[in-house]
């Protein structure tokens, strides 16, 4: 580690507060009553319920989502036996990964005890606190004994990740690698370097999946492990001892091997050894930080080799974070009493299958131009693939139920998977009613920026989720090339339609219709033709206008107002509406907040504000939310008389005339809108109850500033929109920062609007 990296790491761990984890309350502690419920006397009620039924601890405490990361520091991350205290940063780091990838809370526990039996006593006594135990960085062979004894004694999952995590990922990689090179697991021969926890666990899993034990040769620091080599050989090693044929070294046994599994140390495998391996060999060089052989050296002599390492700077990284958070997620969610072989094998299969799926946009963004299509350079998923939790946790949970170790079986896996999806996509719960409605009758949605990677990823999701019938505008050869490069599985003409923006035979009809719309706005026939060629949003808008598409989503490239100008000119406003407006949703930990008008009207008058407010309330109801509207101003219920506050008061009167049932009040300050106590202090008889969820601003400047401040200041908040309101057709204009999920969300909303506004 160079000095700069070392200092950066030390600063990272020291500032702004020491360490990487903290405990945060999940219940409010704002009043005396809150304290009485959280502690004495109210806390006695759940205590007595748990005394009567211990399983209620999962209902009334955090136990069901709490894992202990426990170590004695005897084998810390390549640092060796540095002791329990020195290993604490690693254990905190493990806790951060649990939380980041699976939402699991962790207490890291460093036990200063080298005696395995005493260590077992300490850990076993902690069972009432935790839903699961993750053993970490405990040296072999003690780790085998400790895990075995704890599993026998405890009725919660005990999982030594150094063994099983590496084994699960390695096994998934081997299954996929064999598929790539078309070899059968029952026929291949494997040579293993290292006989520690990970190597033994990996061999056990592979044997369970069909690898023949007599086709495995293991080498440790003393050479080949053969029967009779030493009288007191550890039982775990002895299980893989081969009949003595006189071969003593790795070089002696590597010839003809299909698989090399390295769990040992750097530079153990040489180029000469690699040359002697079988056709299309698999090399898993997992020693860290320097593997048994560097991939470029192996590829130099065997271009046909498939290579995995534990490093992120080479393809096919075997990284335990691919499995341990999600195995525990599935185990905790069914109240598993153990993580058994069936659950591990379920994880292996789920991980292996995910590598065959289309590429995730999140992964594509993280890994740049890497080709992440299934093949020699991509046989296991990347650690940041957001689908890992959705695939692995349900597979593990099902295996726990089928193998009889689940105490709280899941009744509806569709609901469970939806809940897991909420962890991946924070908008999932919010969008659920929209998605459900869209699936009932998917509509044709045209996407003018059809060559964009985000749009292509969104198209894949739309097809997979059954939300829409996408129509992409773009050059077919470019779209096909990018689909292949992105590793997507959608097919033009099957999953979506392409409109060639260079040569569609309908273009004369399109520009003629556009000219008819624009001819009295200074647009000539020649300009109409040029607009169609240069601006795919014009093509999309005309398609919707002609009934060849039901809705349109544009704006992922270019200026919002240029796109909106096309939309406004082609479609105009809905009947009875004299303006349009844009609204953004912020999904914050404190609740959902909608802000209008964020993009369309610079200085709306009272009439326009009233229309925007009514459209905002209508839109919010689509999400299954009852609107509560606050009209905001620097004035608080008449405290200041100026044009801005006056128009907000006028808008309130207009809204109340047109929608007397709507819960609305104003004009008011922002704090009064969000905190009922502040509002009631100023206006005790306010018709607005609770916290407002729609904030209507006096102008676009205030709306955009408020929206961006809230968006950036809330690290846990996510956004939906902008939602375009008031246009005669189901159309939304996004912005260039729109993510794939935002595109998907807005397409689904447009579909629902098209269902209720038939063309």
Swiss-Prot record:
Residues that coordinate or bind NADP(+): 195-198, 288, 320
Pfam families: malic (PF00390), Malic_M (PF03949), PTA_PTB (PF01515)
Gene3D superfamilies for this protein: 3.40.50.10950, Isocitrate/Isopropylmalate dehydrogenase-like (3.40.50.10750), Malic enzyme, N-terminal domain (3.40.50.10380), NAD(P)-binding Rossmann-like Domain (3.40.50.720)
EC numbers, comma separated: 1.1.1.40
Biological function: Catalyzes the decarboxylation of malate to pyruvate. In vitro, shows malolactic enzyme activity in the presence of NADPH. However, it is unlikely that this activity is of relevance in E.coli, which produces little NADPH.
Family affiliation: In the N-terminal section; belongs to the malic enzymes family.
Name recorded for this polypeptide: NADP-dependent malic enzyme
Source organism: Escherichia coli (strain K12)
Residue ranges of the region described as Phosphate acetyltransferase: 429-759
């Amino acid at each position: 580690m160079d000095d700069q990296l070392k200092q950066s790491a030390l600063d990272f761990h020291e500032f702004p507060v020491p360490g990487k984890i903290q405990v945060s309350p999940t219940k409010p502690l704002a009043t005396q009553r809150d304290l009485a419920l959280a502690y004495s006397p109210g806390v006695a009620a759940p205590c007595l319920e748990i005394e009567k039924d211990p399983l209620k601890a999962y209902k009334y405490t955090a136990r069901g989502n709490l894992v202990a990361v426990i170590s004695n520091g005897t084998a810390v991350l390549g640092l060796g036996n540095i002791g329990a205290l020195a290993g604490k940063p690693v254990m905190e780091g493990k806790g951060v990964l649990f939380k980041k990838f699976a939402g699991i809370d962790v207490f890291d526990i460093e036990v200063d005890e080298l005696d395995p039996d005493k260590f077992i006593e300490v850990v076993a006594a902690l069972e009432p606190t935790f839903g699961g135990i993750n053993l970490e960085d405990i040296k072999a062979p003690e780790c085998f004994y400790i895990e075995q004894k704890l599993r026998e004694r405890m009725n919660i999952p005990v999982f030594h990740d150094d063994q099983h995590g590496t084994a699960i990922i390695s096994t998934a990689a081997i299954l996929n690698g064999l598929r790539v090179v078309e070899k059968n697991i029952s026929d291949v021969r494997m040579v293993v370097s290292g006989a520690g926890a990970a190597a033994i666990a990996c061999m056990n899993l592979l044997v369970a999946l069909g690898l023949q034990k007599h086709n495995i040769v293991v080498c440790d620091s003393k050479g080949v492990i053969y029967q009779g080599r030493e009288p007191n050989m550890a039982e775990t090693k002895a299980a893989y001892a081969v009949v003595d044929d006189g071969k003593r070294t790795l070089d002696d046994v590597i010839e003809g091997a299909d698989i090399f599994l390295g769990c040992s140390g750097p530079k153990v495998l040489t180029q000469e050894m690699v040359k002697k391996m079988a056709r299309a060999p698999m090399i898993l060089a997992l020693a860290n930080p320097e593997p048994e052989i560097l991939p470029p050296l192996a590829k130099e002599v065997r271009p046909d080799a498939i290579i995995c390492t534990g490093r992120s700077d080479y393809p096919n990284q075997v990284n335990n974070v691919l499995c341990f958070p999600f195995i525990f997620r599935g185990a905790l969610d069914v109240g598993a009493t153990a993580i058994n072989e069936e659950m591990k094998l379920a994880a292996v299969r789920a991980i292996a299958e995910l590598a065959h799926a289309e590429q995730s946009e999140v992964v594509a963004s993280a890994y740049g131009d890497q080709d992440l299509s299934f093949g020699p350079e991509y046989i296991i998923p990347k650690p940041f693939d957001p689908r890992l939790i959705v695939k692995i946790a349900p597979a593990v949970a099902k295996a726990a139920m089928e193998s009889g170790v689940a105490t709280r079986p899941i009744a509806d896996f569709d609901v469970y998977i939806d809940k897991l999806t909420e962890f991946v996509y924070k908008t999932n719960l919010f969008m659920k009613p929209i998605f459900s409605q869209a699936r009932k009758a998917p509509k044709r949605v045209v996407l003018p920026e059809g060559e964009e990677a985000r749009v292509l990823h969104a198209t894949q999701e739309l097809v997979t989720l059954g939300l829409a019938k996408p129509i992409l505008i773009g050059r077919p050869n470019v779209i096909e090339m990018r689909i292949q490069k992105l590793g997507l599985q959608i097919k033009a003409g099957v999953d979506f339609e392409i409109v060639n923006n260079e040569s569609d035979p309908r273009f004369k009809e399109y520009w003629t219709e556009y000219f008819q719309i624009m001819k009295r706005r200074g647009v000539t026939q020649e300009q109409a033709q040029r607009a169609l060629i240069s601006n795919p949003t014009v093509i999309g808008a005309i398609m919707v206008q002609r009934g060849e598409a039901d809705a349109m989503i544009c704006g992922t490239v270019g200026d919002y107002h240029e796109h909106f100008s096309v939309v406004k000119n082609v479609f105009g406003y809905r009947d009875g509406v004299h303006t349009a407006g844009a609204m953004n949703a912020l999904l914050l930990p404190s609740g959902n907040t909608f802000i209008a008008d964020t993009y369309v009207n610079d200085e709306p008058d009272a009439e326009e504000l009233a229309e925007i407010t009514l459209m905002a309330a209508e839109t919010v109801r689509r999400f299954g939310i009852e609107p509560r509207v606050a009209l905001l101003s620097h004035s608080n219920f008449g405290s200041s008389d100026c044009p801005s506050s006056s128009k907000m008061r006028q808008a309130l009167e207009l809204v109340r005339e047109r929608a007397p049932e709507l819960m609305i009040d104003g004009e008011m300050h922002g704090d009064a809108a969000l905190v009922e106590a502040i509002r009631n202090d100023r206006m005790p008889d306010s018709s607005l109850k609770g916290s407002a969820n729609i904030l209507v601003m006096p102008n676009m400047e205030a709306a955009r500033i408020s929206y961006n401040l809230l968006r950036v200041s809330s690290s846990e908040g996510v956004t939906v929109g902008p939602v375009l309101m008031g246009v005669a057709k189901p159309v939304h204009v996004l912005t260039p920062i729109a993510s794939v999920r935002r595109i998907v969300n807005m397409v689904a909303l447009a579909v629902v609007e098209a269902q209720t506004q038939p063309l």
